[in-house]
Amino acid sequence: MEDQPKDREAEVAGPWFSKWERQCLAEAEQAEQLSPELQEEAAADAAGLKIERQRLWHLFQISATAVAQLYKDSGCQQPGLSMWDPFQNAAMAVTSLYKESGDAYQRSFELGVQVGYQRRVRDVLEWVKKGRSIIRREDLISFLCGKVPPTPQPPRTPRMSPRPPAAASTQAAATESGTPVGVDLQPFHEAIALHGLSGAMASISMRSGPPGSSSQDGGIASSGRWKSSFLENDPNSLSSEELTLLLDSGGVRKRTSAQFGDGSADSPLHKRNRMV
């Protein structure tokens, strides 16, 4: 009855293993059986354990009797008898007891080592048959040593600073894109100076004047802003000659407007209105 559950368990665990694994398990199960010589010794030690003990006990009795006889003969020594024979008998009995005891101990030790090795292999195979495809090193060492594996340590947290959330980074990028950035016009002035246009651009202001400035300054500033914006939008579309003509036309327009202002002030109509 006990063999049937084992056979069923082996049949259930069979599909878990490959053909090579099944072959190895079969060889291991066959190797669990002792060799004929060891089987005889094991049978002699298992079935005839009492006989071995009785033999050692018999040798001990012989040794004890020989020692007692040696003591007895030494107390009542008869003339003509030598003490050598009782002493020799006692020494031989004790020596035989020592040899037989040593041989029995060696046989028991070798048999115990082999039985323990086979038992360990059998236990490991039974543990593997439980369906574990991967065996950790800690589990195997703890199983072979008969100890409980230590509890796993918690994973260490990285020491790097946490990344900002995506919403915060998007908001920061939007804020940076929305803020006005000052344009550095120093390279533009240097490029004009290299083309010999520094004198023409000297009268152009890149910034608007203060609130108390005159309308003429505001016009100059507005024309300067228009030209600077035009040049910033398409600086490569104009050549140096076209840029010079454009700047000169702006200067003529400013001068003609100033002349018209002066002429209107000296006109008779203006004087007549002032006299009235």
Swiss-Prot record:
Signal peptide: none annotated. One of its GO terms (biological process) is protein stabilization. The keyword Nucleus applies. One of its GO terms (cellular component) is nucleus. Disulfide bonds: none annotated. It is found in: Nucleus. Residues 252-276 are annotated as: Nuclear localization signal. Together with HAPSTR1 plays a central regulatory role in the cellular response to molecular stressors, such as DNA damage, nutrient scarcity, and protein misfolding. Regulates these multiple stress response signaling pathways by stabilizing HAPSTR1, but also independently of HAPSTR1. Keywords: Nucleus. Residues 146-182, 204-238, 252-276 are annotated as: Disordered. It comes from Mus musculus. Belongs to the HAPSTR1 family. It comes from the Eukaryota. Residues 166-179, 208-219 have a biased composition (Low complexity). This is HUWE1-associated protein modifying stress responses 2. One of its GO terms (molecular function) is ubiquitin protein ligase binding. Homooligomer. Heterooligomer with HAPSTR1; the interaction is direct and stabilizes HAPSTR1 independently of HUWE1. Interacts with HUWE1. Its main location: nucleus. The gene is Hapstr2. InterPro entries: HAPR1, HAPSTR1-like. Pfam families: TAPR1-like. Residues 149-165 have a biased composition (Pro residues).
